[in-house]
Design a protein with these regions (language model features):
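Extended, low-complexity cationic-aromatic segments
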Residues: 1-87
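Short, basic/hydrophobic alpha-helical segments
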Residues: 80-101
Length: 196
């Protein structure tokens, strides 16, 4: 791979405050453990789940991979995807990269006309000297999430941050996720009101 290109695997994930992930644990012979879906108390204004964009960046084969996260105030949509791509592009350019080989699934917001148009415009602007990296999209085959190496990271992360005995607040869950992946907490990406 070219030394100024980065390989990036993208995905979105929901972090539930209520549902418990599949867990494996040791128990005494004959004993069982049961995980229950938690119930929020009346008046709880926190969302039941937090949407999050993730990018697993592999700069070079010998360099350590990086996992970047951005939580979303709302849900993944084209406009939020564009904001996330712009953030990733600026961040990679600051590290000296010139291109991102972006591998992701076929989510509707990845394939949308708005995202495709933005990527074309962005690449043209970068070619003319704007700050950022060129984005080369490499879609995964349909129904093939196991080909994306970020997927197992979500599974392990959900197990690691889960709390069996109490309901986590949304900000507490976000803090645990960022701590687990050793990521800085960034401002939430905001879903435009017109698509809400």
């Amino acid at each position: 791979m070219h030394p100024t290109w980065a390989l990036g695997f993208g995905d979105e994930v929901w972090w539930s405050r209520l549902a418990q992930p599949d867990q494996h644990c040791w128990t005494d012979t004959g004993a069982t453990t049961t995980w229950h879906e938690l119930v929020p108390p009346k008046g709880d204004l926190d969302p039941t789940a937090l949407a999050c964009y993730g990018r697993l960046v592999r700069p070079q084969p010998q360099a350590p991979e990086q996992l970047w996260l951005r939580f979303v105030a709302g849900r993944p949509v084209s406009a939020v995807t564009i904001a996330f791509l712009a953030w990733c592009s600026t961040r990679l350019a600051a590290q000296g990269f010139t291109a991102l080989l972006l591998i992701w699934d076929n989510a509707s917001w990845h394939r949308s006309q708005a995202v495709q148009h933005w990527i074309r415009q962005h690449n043209q602007q970068v070619k003319r000297g704007a700050v950022g990296v060129r984005l080369v999209v490499c879609p995964l085959p349909s129904k093939s999430p196991w080909l994306n190496p970020i997927e197992p990271k979500w599974v392990h992360g959900k197990r690691a941050v889960s709390e069996p005995d109490r309901l986590l607040r949304a900000d507490e869950l976000e803090a645990r996720v960022c701590a687990y992946y050793d990521c800085e907490r960034e401002a939430h990406l905001v879903m435009p009101k017109k698509v809400a």
